[in-house]
Amino acid sequence: VVSTGSTNDLRISFERRAELTLSAARVAALYRYPVKGFSAERRSSLDVLPSGKVAGDRVLAFRFGGIEVLGDAWSPKATMLCLMNTPGLATLTLALDQDQGCVSVGSEGRTLAEEALDAAGRQRLAEKLAEFALSLPENPLVGHPERLPLQLVGDGVTPRYHDSEKGEVTLHSRESIQALAAALGGELDEVRFRSNIAVEGVKPWGELAWVGRRVRIGRCLYEVTRVKGRCLATHANPTTGVRDLPILTTLTHAFDQEQPTFAVSMRPLGEGGRIMVGDDVELLDV
């Protein structure tokens, strides 16, 4: 959680973003999300694959029944059980053990399910998640019997179920978190934004000016391709599952954004590689 800091001007002119550059930036935290829309897994390192995706990231998803998609193929998040449509999922802890090929589901320190990723285990996990979702006041299953049974898709290895089929690595600065927290008047957990990389040492919103530029992180070189549009998933408190902060309207009203954006997407220039907490971050195209 990042506390608010004082600020004299919460409104930033995004025409001046090119002025916002790096100052001794470093990687502060790394995350991946093995199951689409569920728990963050904090890491000391991440391996970025030649495909441009993080190894072990979004390798599974709970997809609605009746979706006409071939096998484990990618589909939009609107076809899945996720924080955007079911904020209460944030109260669950889902852990993937890739070595053992199993998924465990926990809540408030209790294990609700632990199953292998075989056909029978996937069915039991899907049934448990559907039962849990239907118990929540906000869920996409009530009144939609065609969305059942849920299907647990993915091979547990291949990164696939990102917001876009292209995937890519996502990054935000903690200075931007602090600026947004100040506008909201409270504390803000960066996990709301589900980025892979959090950096420190960047002026607030400076990373938004990196689009089209090259960034070196440790020994790896990336091109920043676009800013990241946001959805209602960011409104869900990562601990309580309650939609408790107006993230989207704050981004547009307090910071003059036409569309709510936070963080950037990047692709590796080359074969990818390993990113470590503490790695230097260098903007090459100043």
PLM regions: where:
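Metal-cofactor-dependent catalytic cores
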Residues: 2-286
